[in-house]
Amino acid sequence: MSCPAAAVLTPDMRAFLRRFHEEMGEPGLPARLRAVEEAGLWWPTSAELTWGAKVAWRNSTRCVGRLYWEALSVRDLRELNTAQAVYEALLQHLDDAFCGGHIRPVISVFGPGVRLHNPQLIRYADDPINADFVDKLRRFGWQPRGERFEVLPLLIEVNGRAELFSLPPQAVQEVAITHPVCLGIGELGLRWHALPVISDMHLDIGGLHLPCAFSGWYVQTEIAARDLADVGRYDQLPAVARALGLDTSRERTLWRDRALVELNVAVLHSFDAAGVKLADHHTVTAHHVRFEEREARAGREVRGKWSWLVPPLSPATTPLWSRRYRAREESPRFVRARCPFHTPTVHASTGHAPTG
């Protein structure tokens, strides 16, 4: 994988290297800057990449789970130069991150010639939020079977050549949603995948953008209050309310609110029963307060986007409700992948080709 050359060090590169050496207590900053200038290019070392990825998580204004930023496992995969190799690395990412249900935070960083077209590694074809991406996959020759919760294939591009790959069943860990009391909720046939892996972001370190796949673990509200509940998603609150026997004839019965709480109860119960790590919104917001306290002791300001940090369920009961943050994100950071100005050549995978 070729590395991008720069005639001189940019201010962003200088700032990144300066912060890296300061925070890590690494000597030799003048020598490092001089070596980069003499070479005429900057290609981060593995140590610089690892620090940059961890700090990008620390700086993420949309993430409420930043307390564990130092525990991020960073996989330096910049040398991979085929779609097949990237695909195999992503399968390993899923296995490493799931860790038998003891989910751990992992990031896989690729070279600049790689593009992961999927917004997340695991998404469903019948989820309305994925409608545009499903249309894109259709143009590349994939045909959905029309099943509920059908896992989408991966579209991986390397140096302008795109290939489709199916995720084998053993790579996709899912949890069936049941309720500890209401059997009717379990009869709805709901389920969700255990591992959220964001794959449409780039890691911005010193102005260098590298594609990556980043995963932590779910907060139950992400699944129960958004994915399964939003009207523009799976819109399951009416079905949950019927399973609970609630009066849905008028809004003043608060049937939506009651169904929403019980769906959250069901998701928490189901992940616990399956032995899969899942945060709850009260604990994770308390952890964010601890994160803020640690950062204050280190002399660093915590920035955040309030609407992302405050949960969609009972937000006023959490400690973040009354807090305010500056929203502008600092580098290192995660940024949305830029859309390419070319149409990749599409090839059928010779490995796990998607089924239709």
From Swiss-Prot:
Transmembrane segments: none annotated. Heme binds at C63. One of its GO terms (molecular function) is nitric-oxide synthase activity. InterPro entries: Nitric_oxide_synthase_Oase-su, NOS, NOS_dom_1, NOS_dom_2, NOS_dom_3, NOS_N, NOS_N_sf. Its cofactor is heme; (6S)-5,6,7,8-tetrahydrofolate. Its EC number is 1.14.14.47. Keywords: Heme, Iron, Metal-binding, Oxidoreductase. The keyword Heme applies. One of its GO terms (biological process) is nitric oxide biosynthetic process. PANTHER family: NITRIC OXIDE SYNTHASE (PTHR43410:SF1), NITRIC OXIDE SYNTHASE OXYGENASE (PTHR43410). Homodimer. Forms a complex with trpS2; one homodimer of trpS2 binds one homodimer of nos. Catalyzes the production of nitric oxide. The complex between TrpRS II and nitric oxide synthase oxygenase catalyzes the regioselective nitration of tryptophan at the 4-position. This protein is similar to the oxygenase domain of eukaryotic nitric oxide synthases but lacks the reductase domain which, in eukaryotes, is responsible for transfer of electrons to the ferric heme during nitric oxide synthesis. Affinity for substrate L-arginine is increased by TrpRS II. This is Nitric oxide synthase oxygenase.
